[in-house]
Amino acid sequence: PTSASQTASRHLDIVFLCTKSYQSKEALKGLSNSLSESTIIIPVSNGVDNKEELQPLTSARVFDACVYIVSHLIKPGLVKKSTDIFALVLPMALQEETEALLLKAGLRHKFSSDIKKELWKKFLFISAMGTMTSYYGIGMGSVYKQHTKELEGLLNEIYGIARAEGILLEPKAIDKAMETASKLPLDAPTSLWLDLKKGKGSELESLSHYLIKKAKEHGIETPIMQKIYERLR
């Protein structure tokens, strides 16, 4: 299917919401006739605020989760997975209700007792890389080689916001992110950069502006992210 169906014959038990973050609300609205209070909604869009954005819109139960995957849209309804990278991270609260399903489907997964920390661990990297590749118009490996100090500075800004939000990422999280970046191909793109180049909708608000708003709430300066967002918005 290329859009949400409103003709389901019964209420759905579990819904994996695999849209872009800016499409999630519309997708959820399209499913409204198929949801009940017992339905489990699992959004896996990039970002750390999916649950807080979606829960007020439905009586179904929304849970935070994230996915590690490298893929891109071929056409509506067809997504190509580009590498073997795949891992679904879910909250421990969903283990009993979802593990049998995930094992049967052959999906690599793990359950976490601190899902917010898992979200921010992924977000630290994808936010920094997504915004910097888009700002400079170069791949991830090139960002690391040409703008090493700025990349490290941006990672530190995001790390600081996470701490202010009560998310205690490991002390070496930035070092690990830099190490990952150092191993990436020079021309490796990010989905945010690709979407902005196409002039389509993008996750800029989720990956960049969200951090600026949170920084202001906590009185934190984010000059690098502010500069990038002002150019890209």
Question: Where are these predicted regions, by residue range?
Answer:
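Internal alpha-helical scaffold of NAD(P)-dependent oxidoreductase catalytic cores
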Residues: 34, 53, 57-61, 76-172
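Rossmann-like NAD(P)(H) cofactor-binding subdomain of soluble oxidoreductases
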Residues: 1-78
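Short, flexible turn/loop "capping" segments at secondary-structure junctions
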Residues: 9, 80-83, 185
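A general structural signal for well-ordered alpha-helical segments in protein cores
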Residues: 12, 24, 50-51, 95-99, ...
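Glycine-rich beta-alpha junction loops
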Residues: 46-48, 66-71, 94, 115-119, ...
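Residue-level detector of family-conserved "landmark" positions at structurally sensitive sites
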Residues: 40, 65, 112, 172, ...
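NAD(P)-dependent Rossmann-like dehydrogenase/reductase catalytic/cofactor-binding core
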Residues: 103, 152-233
